[in-house]
């Protein structure tokens, strides 16, 4: 509790789970002097009991995402899923596709499509987002269903450098032929 109060927020992640299963964000509400799980205030006793009840987990320090992501939906971490493939002839990596994953009120604190998050294609040349789709109901969203913020037409900042950086990273893993990356853009890049 002291660490949470000092840092302000942490992600609590269970080992061996995928697709955002069991992930919660722990924050501290300084005005109410109380911890929160997934943005809901709880008592200090409930917080301690929650930690005691879960013994196979780790904490990850929360990162502040780029403001363009907060403008779309600020209650979840919204990542880009990059797929890089190695060309079998040239042995050079290429960005095969990229999507912006966007959380919803159903997925707090994560953006996973398998939990009801949205997925918008990113134009590989321009870095501009398409409309978003929900894998659960196949609905199409030009604006975020919870925040009302535009999705379609939004420019991913620093797109060209981001693509270049992904290829540099992929080249550092020469034994890989297919890599799926989940990237969080921050103000620093």
Regions found by a protein language model. Give the residues of each.
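A long amphipathic alpha-helix within ATP-dependent nucleotide-binding catalytic cores
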Residues: 53-75, 84-90, 95-186
């Amino acid at each position: 509790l002291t660490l949470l109060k000092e840092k302000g927020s942490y992600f609590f992640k269970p080992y061996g789970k995928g697709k955002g299963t069991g992930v919660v964000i722990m924050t501290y509400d300084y005005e109410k002097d109380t911890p929160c799980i997934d943005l809901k205030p709880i008592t200090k006793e409930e917080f301690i009991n929650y930690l005691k009840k879960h013994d196979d987990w780790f904490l990850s320090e929360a990162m502040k995402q780029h403001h363009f992501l907060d403008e779309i939906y600020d209650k979840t971490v919204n990542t880009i899923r990059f797929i890089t493939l190695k060309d079998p002839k040239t042995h050079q990596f290429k960005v095969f596709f990229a999507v912006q994953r966007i959380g919803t009120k159903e997925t707090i604190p994560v953006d996973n499509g398998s939990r009801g998050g949205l997925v918008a294609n990113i134009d590989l040349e321009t870095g501009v987002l398409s409309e978003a789709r929900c894998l659960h109901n196949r609905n199409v969203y030009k604006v975020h269903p919870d925040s009302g913020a535009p999705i379609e037409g939004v420019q991913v900042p620093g797109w060209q450098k981001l693509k270049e950086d992904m290829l540099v990273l992929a080249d550092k893993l020469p034994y890989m032929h297919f890599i799926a990356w989940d990237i969080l853009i921050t103000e620093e890049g």
